[in-house]
Each structure stands twice: as C-alpha cells, then as structure tokens.
Amino acid sequence: MTPQDRPLVSVIVPSFNLGRYAKETIDGVLMQTYNSLEIIIIDGGSTDETLAVLANYPSIHVISEFDNGPAEAIMKGLRICSGEFILFQLISDGLLEPSWISKCVNELQKHPEASLCWGLVRRKEESGELAELALLRWEKTDPPNEAGMFISWLTYGSGFHETNMIIRKKVALEIVLSFNLPNSKDDIFYYFTAEFHARGYISRCIPIVASYSRIHSNQRSFDEMFNKKLFNYEKIWRRKLWRIRRKVLLTTKPHRFIDSNGAIVGMLELSIKSRAIFLVKIILSSTRLRLLNLMVTCKRRIPLLRIFVNYFRLSIGR
C-alpha cells in the first residue's frame, strides 16, 4: 500500500480545560508513522491555555464552543470528519506506539469482516509514570477476537479502550448518531460497546500496549467512577447487556455477526453444556462486581475493606 493509497483516518479529540496535556497528545498523533491523517479538536470552550497551545498547530481543525461533554463533542466531530476510519483520542491521553494507526488500518484491511480494531491501555500517573493496565484481566492473557470478544463482553460487561480504538466510519456513524442519551455527559463509550455487540459487529485486538490513559486531578476518583459509570448507567447499557445474555442463553436462535455492510459473516450457537458454564461465569462476575461496588461505598468507613477492594479488583480484572 503506497502512501497515496492509504485511506484517510480522522482523529477526533474532545477537549476541555486540559491544555497542559494538549501538546503531548497532539504530538503523539503527529509522530505516527501513518501520515494520511485528519485531526479534529472539539473544544468545549476552554478557559485555560488549551487554545493557545492549539494555535501552534495550523494543520489541525479546531472548533471551540460550549458543549455538554465528550459525547456531544464526539457526535459533532463525526458529523464533520472525512476519514474512512475514526480514532477517538481524549486530550489528556495519548498514543504510546508510534505505528499504532498503521497497524490498525492494516489489520482492518486484512480482515474486512471486522469493524473495529483496538489495543491495550496502560494507566499513566500525573507525574508521567506508567502504571498498570487499564483492565487488569489482560495482564494475564491476551484479549480474544471476534466471537471471543463478544463472549467476554457478555461475561464481564467491560468495553473497548476508547483511547486507541479505530472504527470504520460507517459503523461509528450508525451507532453513535443513533444514540438518544438522557444526558450527553454520560460515558458514550459504554453505550457504544453495548450497541456495537448488540448489532453483531465484530472486532480485532492487537495485543500490545498502544496508548495510555492519564490519571489526573480533574478526573473522577476510582470510587466515583466505579459507582457512577458502572451502576448509574446500568439502566440503559446494562439492560441491553442482559437482554443479549438472555437471548444467547435462553433461546435457540443464534447470535449473528455482520460486517460493516450488514452481510452475515458468522453465527454463535452454544450447546446446553456451554450455556450452563457461561451462566455460572456471568453469575460469578456479576456477584463480584456488585460486591466490589458495596465495598467501595463502605471502605471509607471501614479502612480494613481497602484490602478486600484491591483483591476483588484483581479477581474481576478491573
């Protein structure tokens, strides 16, 4: 594939008052070995140094106006972008692997049945020190592909890493612009993952650490994120998760997998034994998750519970 034949990748970057990280994030994109890029910054009306930093990059497209959070910013970026593939990049996070975009485009062209490519994420302290993987489960084993990732989502309910996933624009538009979220400040990526799997699209994972997710002072603490993100959003995206679980476990109708054009590329049918094993895994995962939520809620009152919180985080891969 010559540089002239490379499909355009649109990098959509939501931003708000995190200018101290903007240069590092943008430079990480510009240093990619893949050069057929369009960078779109959707800024929510920052009042810090963000716009001054962005002014040093005349080649990027910047829109700065009030919005209701990352979900609205992403929707806005999708409506104006021109790329065949989409990469979402939060302004406080960045890419670690300089050939990541090239690897993803090659993977998606090699596997036309797949609609999304993603990789691992390592947390990054505000000091710049790299920490553990964002999902501890993948410290022990490589993430699965295609039907295996669908099963993993059904079991654990966790999504793709939004800081490095590259999606076919057609699929991103179909899913994201169909959302009717009760509050556009909600975490759009949990809804995206649920809708992606419910519609039958499949993904590919390149099992390398591709990006980092920064832990900073403006970010919600783990306690707040866990309580809010994993349980308050349950009314919408976990309801969809349980609906698909019931479909797979209780009906004989197979779950179909489709490509970005809607063509069927596979089916998932489980034997009675496999359904029973799968059900036990779901029950264990859900029980551990709810127990961890209870411990997180109580740990400030009972310091000893901190030990058990850390244990259960490891046991469920959070």
What annotation goes with each model-predicted range?
Residues 36-45, 63-66:
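Short beta-strand/loop segment that forms part of the nucleotide-sugar
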Residues 86-87:
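Short aromatic/hydrophobic "clamp" motif used to bind/position activated sugar donors
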